[in-house]
């Protein structure tokens, strides 16, 4: 009998960007993002983009976060005072 255990962890992090606070709650199953919620006091245009970012991250491995964030910003998303690196830092797991 072989038992296969994966580590299930919840993380919550606040990251202060130049012009806003990013709040992230991550539900990880091993190194995969099972669920994610991003909120904060920053502006993002188009306004529904945050949902798209969460959808892009959900199900991906944490090693792919940098690439996903950069791809997301390459789609024309604008976040005044908040840089792609701010989201990468907010999503960085200890």
From Swiss-Prot:
Superkingdom of the organism of origin = Archaea
Tell me one GO biological process term: protein lipoylation
Entry keyword set? ATP-binding, Ligase, Nucleotide-binding
Q: Name one GO molecular function term.
A: lipoate-protein ligase activity
Where are the coiled-coil regions? none
User: EC number(s) in its UniProt entry?
Assistant: 6.3.1.20
The pathway is: Protein modification; protein lipoylation via exogenous pathway; protein N(6)-(lipoyl)lysine from lipoate: step 1/2; Protein modification; protein lipoylation via exogenous pathway; protein N(6)-(lipoyl)lysine from lipoate: step 2/2
User: What Pfam families does the entry give?
Assistant: Lip_prot_lig_C (PF10437)
**Primary enzyme class:** ligase
Reaction catalysis annotation: L-lysyl-[lipoyl-carrier protein] + (R)-lipoate + ATP = N(6)-[(R)-lipoyl]-L-lysyl-[lipoyl-carrier protein] + AMP + diphosphate + H(+)
Name any GO cellular component annotation: protein-containing complex
Q: According to its UniProt entry, what is the function of this protein? A: Part of a lipoate-protein ligase complex that catalyzes both the ATP-dependent activation of exogenously supplied lipoate to lipoyl-AMP and the transfer of the activated lipoyl onto the lipoyl domains of lipoate-dependent enzymes. Can also use octanoate as substrate.
Checking PANTHER family in the record gives: OCTANOYL-[GCVH]:PROTEIN N-OCTANOYLTRANSFERASE (PTHR43679:SF2), OCTANOYLTRANSFERASE LIPM-RELATED (PTHR43679)
Question: What is said about its interaction partners and assembly?
Answer: Heterodimer composed of LplA and LplB.
What more does the entry say?
A: In contrast to E.coli, where the lipoate-protein ligase is encoded by a single gene product (LplA) with a large N-terminal domain and a small C-terminal domain, the same activity in T.acidophilum is dependent on two separate proteins, corresponding to the two domains of E.coli LplA, respectively.
What is the name attached to this protein's record?
Lipoate-protein ligase A subunit 2
Q: Which organism is it from?
A: Thermoplasma acidophilum (strain ATCC 25905 / DSM 1728 / JCM 9062 / NBRC 15155 / AMRC-C165)
Organism placement in taxonomy: Archaea, Methanobacteriati, Thermoplasmatota, Thermoplasmata, Thermoplasmatales
